[in-house]
Swiss-Prot record:
Protein name, entry field: Succinate dehydrogenase [ubiquinone] cytochrome b small subunit, mitochondrial
GO molecular function, one term: heme binding
Keyword Ribonucleoprotein included in the entry's annotation: no
Organism of this sequence: Ovis aries
Segments in the Mitochondrial intermembrane topological domain: 85-89, 142-158
Predominant subcellular localization, coarse grouping: mitochondrion
Amino acid sequence: MALSRLSVLCGVREGRALFLRTPVVRPALVSAFLQGRPAQGWCGTQHIHLSPSHHSGSKAASLHWTGERVVSVLLLGLIPAAYLNPCSAMDYSLAATLTLHSHWGIGQVVTDYVHGDAVQKAAKTGLLVLSAFTFAGLCYFNYHDVGICKAVAMLWKL
């Protein structure tokens, strides 16, 4: 029953789906678009440049983006490792990576949504202070109390 409904939706006739016989985009248009020239029947006049600009961006921006991805992947492995082996090294690693990950994420929100030079500088300064206090607070909690891993385990036991 479900297959017959699916065949009606997909336009199956004689064992072949309708979308397999009907091209969505004509190859000539794609070829012309990639070569940067308009084709017959192409009404768009906007050009999209696929090659990277040598004038925009820098090596530092590329390294920053790579660093963000490394920290995100590191967190994916660090959280289960902290659950399986709670120790002070895991606590301090979590404190550093969570603070850095949060700092970069909220920094992007500030960059995207806070407008005006003075306001944006003040927001970024406030974020830097907040991140420093967050890291210091987590380190203080790790040193003087049970630590992040054991605190989460205690919350789960409630």
